[in-house]
């Protein structure tokens, strides 16, 4: 099944966020949220509702991190909650990026988290009454994207990526109903990425090209080498995101977090050696390299990538395509002075968020 854009995405929405779903919910509509959970979260809520009052919520999706972590699903009608459906499993990790997808079908919502089927929730009220999405809680959002299998197709003119195009939801066998406790085991699903060109978008702004899906921008949004400031530098819980495509004949590229003339953190994938080098440069002198990784080389020639760097009090944490790959202990301790991002080498940049 092919999916196509139905409305421009909301970029970098400020939490709590409430926005209109153009045309309301429709059968086949998929809503994708990509973001990062705060390091010390309490709760997250995604509501599909009628209007902005919050009195009528068709689907309340509510991860709660207390008591070992679980997810509550519910419906509110005329200001009154119905019976809860709980899944005693937490699909989100503290301080880590996530991709959350909701697929609207005639009888239920299906929910995927990080490419895995998580739960389905049967409609208690007509879904076509829903015209608003609201998001709140302990998270940062990069975007909310809307796509549908019934919209007119637009031919992509740019490369696809690996992290956030509509996923293929598993089908329930006919005659079987989903249980409210335990639900179903997670199932792997293939995913491809939308390329979103944005440079420090206005929070909550919608892109102005509804006729072209996010992956269809033909012009590179960034020049290499790329430099930009990091407002207020780093501090615990501060994170940045860099997405791009590795060139087919790439030898290496690097991401530098700079502190004046020094490099506090140098992240340097080298394709001939199949390693990712980490280091610090102080007064033009490099320190000892760190090369070990728990798994294989996470970057590949000719393929897309998404790098997320989270600052904590003692280290930087790095995830590639949603998978944690390493920690790098701070060698330069004055985190607010680390205020410049540099990206260079054999890649094309598609998205930077600082």
From Swiss-Prot:
Write the protein's name: Galectin-9
Q: What is known of its domains?
A: Contains two homologous but distinct carbohydrate-binding domains.
**Keywords from the UniProt entry:** Cytoplasm, Immunity, Ion transport, Lectin, Nucleus, Repeat, Secreted, Transport
The record's Gene3D superfamilies line, in alphabetical order, gives:
2.60.120.200
Entry binding sites for a beta-D-galactoside 1 = 47, 60, 64, 74, 81-87
**What additional remark is attached to this entry?**
The LGALS9-like proteins are encoded by a duplicated regions on chromosome 17; there are at least 3 genes coding for galectin-9-like proteins.
Q: What induces it?
A: By viral mimic polyinosinic:polycytidylic acid (poly I:C) and lipopolysaccharides (LPS) in microglia.
Gene Ontology annotations of biological process type: cellular response to type II interferon; cellular response to virus; ERK1 and ERK2 cascade; female pregnancy; inflammatory response; maintenance of protein location; maternal process involved in female pregnancy; monoatomic ion transport
Q: Give an example GO cellular component term for this record.
A: extracellular space
Query: Domain of life of the organism in this record?
Result: Eukaryota
Q: Which GO terms describe its molecular function?
A: carbohydrate binding; disaccharide binding; enzyme binding; galactoside binding; oligosaccharide binding; protein serine/threonine kinase activator activity; receptor ligand activity; signaling receptor binding
Q: Does the keyword rRNA-binding apply?
A: no
- Protein's gene: Lgals9
Domain Galectin span(s) in chain numbering: 17-147, 226-354
Q: In which tissues is it expressed?
A: The isoform Long is expressed exclusively in the small intestine.
Residues bound to a beta-D-galactoside 2 are 266, 270, 280, 286-292
Q: Where in the cell is it found?
A: Cytoplasm; Nucleus; Secreted
Functionally, this protein is described as follows: Binds galactosides. Has high affinity for the Forssman pentasaccharide. Ligand for HAVCR2/TIM3. Binding to HAVCR2 induces T-helper type 1 lymphocyte (Th1) death. Also stimulates bactericidal activity in infected macrophages by causing macrophage activation and IL1B secretion which restricts intracellular bacterial growth. Ligand for P4HB; the interaction retains P4HB at the cell surface of Th2 T helper cells, increasing disulfide reductase activity at the plasma membrane, altering the plasma membrane redox state and enhancing cell migration.
